[in-house]
């Protein structure tokens, strides 16, 4: 198998927002926005250095992103977000490094969200990863494969959750913003879904990539063989059922609602394997800063509870 070259291992913290922006460069950026209508236009760094870095390397990063997707998964993709960031290990300018994040949707049977990070290398940019075998990256495709396998059951749970929360006035982020999430896996309205992969890129392309392109019974059988060999791809499936509540709503009231919501959605969430969680965020989020889950930072702590648990 042909190897994709130019990878750089990254051990520093990637900053999702704009921690180093000068005030005069951010005066037009709103402090908080609503996920109902915000399109994500301010996500990323906005210092002069970020703008220069983005302009210089954007086209190359997009090309390398598309080449990686085609080589690793065998599909085309659509670019949703290209942002610049500044990473700092100290306070001096020399301690700061710049990079790009590219987020897109891979045109698979179950379209999936895919993120790559790039850093400067020579006169260009190279892909950087926290895992030598690209387990973080290939997990996006494995999630889509598992979603394809359990799609009727997952969709039933998602639509049940959607129905329950919408009739009580809760909602999800708009689709344009949803597609700009820095997430590896399947993103749907009210749901983020991912799982584990194997930490070996060459082995992934040899064993998983051919199965991705199968249909029907052939797909199910070959995927089951992979599950038997790598049980973590089923065992560690994660379904996050996500909703937002109005910024003026009482947090304790929402927390009580979430507790009761677990009971009404429990039966459908138990229909397929993996871990499920219900997460509510206050709809007063940063226009640029991301939280530890790579979602726009809410000004209130999340409300979360396990879902699909046996009584």
Stretches with model-predicted labels:
Residues 77-119:
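Exposed beta-strand-loop-beta-strand "reactive/processing" segments of non-cytosolic proteins
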Residues 40, 45, 53, 270-311:
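Hydrophilic extracytoplasmic domains
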């Amino acid at each position: 198998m042909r190897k994709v070259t130019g990878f750089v291992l990254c051990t520093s913290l990637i900053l999702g927002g704009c921690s180093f922006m000068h005030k005069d460069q951010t005066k037009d950026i709103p402090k908080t926005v609503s996920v109902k209508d915000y399109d994500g236009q301010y996500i990323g760094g906005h210092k002069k250095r970020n703008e220069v870095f983005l302009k210089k390397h954007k086209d190359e990063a997009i090309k390398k992103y598309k080449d990686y997707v085609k080589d690793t998964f065998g599909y085309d993709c659509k670019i949703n977000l290209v942002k610049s960031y500044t990473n700092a290990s100290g306070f001096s300018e020399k301690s700061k490094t710049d990079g790009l994040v590219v987020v897109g949707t891979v045109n698979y049977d179950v379209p999936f969200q895919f993120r790559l990070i790039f850093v400067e290398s020579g006169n260009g940019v190279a892909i950087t990863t926290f895992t030598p075998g690209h387990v973080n990256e290939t997990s996006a495709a494995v999630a889509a494969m598992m979603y394809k396998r359990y799609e009727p059951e997952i969709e039933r749970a998602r639509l049940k959750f959607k129905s329950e929360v919408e009739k009580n006035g809760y909602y999800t982020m708009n689709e344009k913003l949803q597609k700009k999430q820095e997430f590896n896996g399947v993103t749907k309205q009210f749901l983020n879904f991912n799982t584990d992969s194997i930490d070996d890129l060459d082995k992934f392309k040899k064993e998983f990539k051919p199965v991705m392109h199968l249909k029907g019974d052939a797909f199910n059988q070959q995927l089951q063989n992979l599950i038997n060999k790598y049980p973590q791809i089923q065992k560690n499936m994660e379904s996050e059922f996500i909703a937002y509540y109005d910024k003026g709503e009482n947090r304790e009231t929402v927390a009580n609602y979430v507790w009761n919501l677990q009971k009404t959605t429990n039966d459908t969430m138990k229909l397929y394997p993996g871990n499920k969680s219900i997460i509510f965020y206050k709809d007063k989020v940063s226009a640029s800063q991301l939280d530890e889950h790579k979602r726009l930072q809410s000004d209130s702590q999340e409300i979360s509870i396990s879902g699909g648990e046996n009584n």
